[in-house]
Amino acid sequence: DSLALAAIAAHFARRGDVRVGAIIVDHGLQEDSAAVAAQTAQTLTDLGLHPVITEKVQVPVGNMGPEMAARTARYTAFTKAVEATGARAVLLGHTLDDQAETVLLGLSRGSGTRSLAGMPPVRVEGGVTYLRPFLGLRRTDMLDICDAENLTPWIDPTNTDETLMRARIRHSVLPYLEEHLGGDVARSLARTASVAGPDAEYLD
């Protein structure tokens, strides 16, 4: 998803509409993570993004669990990169499918209205503006973009590790719901998020 986002952003950067760089966050959770980060940095440089920053982070799990610990470390790296470059916003490659998973995760934790709202397309956190331009697109659309640009995305092994809640929702729960309820459950969940978003924002 992030590689497809980089390709689209690079397209607009080449037109001179915006200046776009990239940050690669190496969580160090796989043995070859440094090599993957280096290869990704080269790919993004070849696309014309500048600067391309690689940030190695520590992921201390503690009491928050591996997924939340990785997210916390990642967003800390984003903040550091914004401060170093003066970037006006951070683009994130979350898709409609990610949104559906986030809604289900929130519901499973009893997060109330905020869980139904999922991820907002625009959010300011820690003084940094985050934009999610692909919340209306499917994960398959991201793969199509990569194919069209002759890019080979790296598939994070944790995305298929069903000991992690999000991967379990992606590969087991959502397919089960769609099989037994019928219809496009992921799209329905994402639509619910878009409707509930303004309410959650108001309540906040």
Residue ranges of model-derived segments:
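Core alpha/beta nucleotide-donor-binding catalytic domains of modification enzymes
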Residues: 1-175
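ATP/NTP-dependent adenylation/nucleotidyl-transfer catalytic domains that generate, transfer
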Residues: 164-204
